């Protein structure tokens, strides 16, 4: 099914581009996510609507689409295809064709592809995210700090190719969080659980 990395990348992109936050909130009759809070289509912004169940479902969907893309590519065509699917799924979430290439910030999908490629690093990411989130209640800061450690952890575990790939993904994640970074420095970033 995956004769080369390009097909695996395209497969990953299509799975990654499914906008679960938009789909679930529309089904639930909630207003357009892009018009509230941060304008993001991910779970943190869904949480700002006050719908915790929808936020959890969005988080799970955005994470598992990344995991599915990587695991399917890995099983059918090996690690090279899995890496291509990793990049494709992440870019699909960030720049989905269905939403005119204006997607989410990628945290859940980052965790999902990491889980599929090397699960111990995904657990470490989640542990760091939870620690920072518990102490600061800033979702964005939690993701930024956890993502910084991921390439280092992958390198330390003996996976330099994965480390390089996730260094690229981390740069993209930070780019998508540039407005959050500005708000963090300005002291105006929204905290976890705050409604729009």
From Swiss-Prot:
One of its GO terms (molecular function) is acyl-phosphate glycerol-3-phosphate acyltransferase activity. It is a multi-pass membrane protein. Pfam families: G3P_acyltransf (PF02660). The keyword rRNA-binding does not apply. InterPro entries: G3P_acylTferase_PlsY. It comes from the Bacteria. One of its GO terms (cellular component) is plasma membrane. It catalyses: an acyl phosphate + sn-glycerol 3-phosphate = a 1-acyl-sn-glycero-3-phosphate + phosphate. Keywords: Cell inner membrane, Cell membrane, Lipid biosynthesis, Lipid metabolism, Membrane, Phospholipid biosynthesis, Phospholipid metabolism, Transferase, Transmembrane, Transmembrane helix. Its EC number is 2.3.1.275. Pathway: Lipid metabolism; phospholipid metabolism. The chain crosses the membrane at residues 5-25, 70-90, 111-131, 152-172. Disulfide bonds: none annotated. It is found in: Cell inner membrane. GO terms for biological process: phospholipid biosynthetic process. Catalyzes the transfer of an acyl group from acyl-phosphate (acyl-PO(4)) to glycerol-3-phosphate (G3P) to form lysophosphatidic acid (LPA). This enzyme utilizes acyl-phosphate as fatty acyl donor, but not acyl-CoA or acyl-ACP. PANTHER family: GLYCEROL-3-PHOSPHATE ACYLTRANSFERASE-RELATED, INNER MEMBRANE PROTEIN YGIH. Probably interacts with PlsX. Belongs to the PlsY family. This is Glycerol-3-phosphate acyltransferase. The gene is plsY.
């Amino acid at each position: 099914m995956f004769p080369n990395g390009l097909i695996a990348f395209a497969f990953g992109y299509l799975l990654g581009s499914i906008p679960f936050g938009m789909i679930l909130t529309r089904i639930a009759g909630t207003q357009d996510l892009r018009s509230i809070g941060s304008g993001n289509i991910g779970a943190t912004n869904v949480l700002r609507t006050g719908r915790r169940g929808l936020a959890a479902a969005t988080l799970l969907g955005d994470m598992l689409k990344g995991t599915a893309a990587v695991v399917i590519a890995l099983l059918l065509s090996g690690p090279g295809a899995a890496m291509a699917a990793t990049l494709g799924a992440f870019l699909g979430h960030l720049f989905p064709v269905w939403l005119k290439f204006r997607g989410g910030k990628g945290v859940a999908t980052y965790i999902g592809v990491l889980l599929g490629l090397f699960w111990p690093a995904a657990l470490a990411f989640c542990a760091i995210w939870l620690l920072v989130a518990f102490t600061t209640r800033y979702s964005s800061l939690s993701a930024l700090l956890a993502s910084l450690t991921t390439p280092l952890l992958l390198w330390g575990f003996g996976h330099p190719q994965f480390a390089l790939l996730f260094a690229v993904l981390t740069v993209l994640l930070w780019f998508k969080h540039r407005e959050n970074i500005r708000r963090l420095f300005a002291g105006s970033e929204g905290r976890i659980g705050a409604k729009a």
